[in-house]
Amino acid sequence: MSPPQRTPGAGPPPAAEPAVIDPRRVAAVVPAFNESGKIGDVVRKVPRRYAACVIVVDDCSSDDTSDEARAAGAERVVRHPVNRGVGAGIRTGLMTAKREGYEFAAILSGDDQHEPDELPRVLTPLFRDEADLVQGSRWLPGGAAPGIPSDRRWLTRIYPLLFRLASGYPSTDGTNGFRAFRLSMLDDPRIRLDQDWLDRYELEPYLLYQAVRCGYRVREVPVTVRYHARGTTKMHWFRDAWRLLRPLVYLRLGIQR
């Protein structure tokens, strides 16, 4: 069966109607690497009235990320025996959610950049059957990016233009990790998250690109992304910028599927 026709462009912010969201159908997936001091806050902030299960995937941290997540009340903590990358962490979390019978997954950053109280923004279009994948955008009206460094602002503004050139979809924020989607999409043989080349930053743009390419209904909604003064980014700009671009190049040219 072909997926429903996607809705191009970004619609207006959905009304936050918690009553429409059944948390028993939702898992929040949180990839984390050396996030001690932050991961506990993330877990505690996830309202269980929107997501019944928080799945933290610890990508072989050298600190006490796993213990802190458990102490904060994470329903599932999965630890990789070796460091594999954020994409592998997301994949593990999604597969765990799917295996446990959840219908929807919301992905949140483990470094406390996202606002879990905004989960209704990414979940409501799914429960209303208006979208199959809902992408958060800090650049839509109603979104925000307080404290964003100038280099990150530049990257997150240029990338959507390249995504649009490659896919035809008018994305405004394809690098934002706050999103939610139907886990049934992973049953589509055209969406192959189990490829090793997606282990790091490639997986998220791959998923978005393939959702568009395969005709799923993709929608953007405004969200907040906060940049904290403490800590340093784990991104290495030139290398990881290529990792974000690689799925667009490989899929557009047919090098990968």
Regions found by a protein language model. Give the residues of each.
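A conserved acidic beta->alpha catalytic loop
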Residues: 58-66
